[in-house]
Amino acid sequence: RKHNISMHLEDDLLMANMDARLIIQVLVNLINNAIKYTPENSNISLNARRVEDKILIEVQDDGNGVLHPDQLFEMFYTENNHSGDTRRGMGLGLSLCKSIVLAHGGKIWVENVKPHGACFKFVLDAVEVKLYE
């Protein structure tokens, strides 16, 4: 499947106390879901920026959006709005993402984007780094 994936990172150095392997797994899962739930040639973007004392990371797509955002992170919950991908998940990926983000003291949620699409967001505590001391 072909998709247009873009990434926008804030110019500043973004640092957080985290297990990088686990947070990468969260990102991989969110991007894989965006690919699975959007038609071919859709746009998917990964954005990261600082918001006050947090780092906000977003994975946004221009697919059909989310039918039940309040249930999406529950274990074994799946939605039936695949766009051309017939693989059916077990409903564990987003639940695992939530567990990982919560274990890091963060928060994860999803918002529908008008006119179409979904934006998965999570925040982690930012860490101040002084490079020239």
List each language-model region with its residue ranges.
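Short beta-strand/loop element within the Bergerat-fold HATPase_c
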Residues: 41-53
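Short helix-loop "hinge" at the ATP-lid/N-box region of the Bergerat-fold HATPase_c
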Residues: 34-35
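Conserved catalytic submotifs in the C-terminal HATPase_c
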Residues: 4-14
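Short alpha-helical Gxxx[C/S/T] motif in the catalytic ATP-binding
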Residues: 93, 97
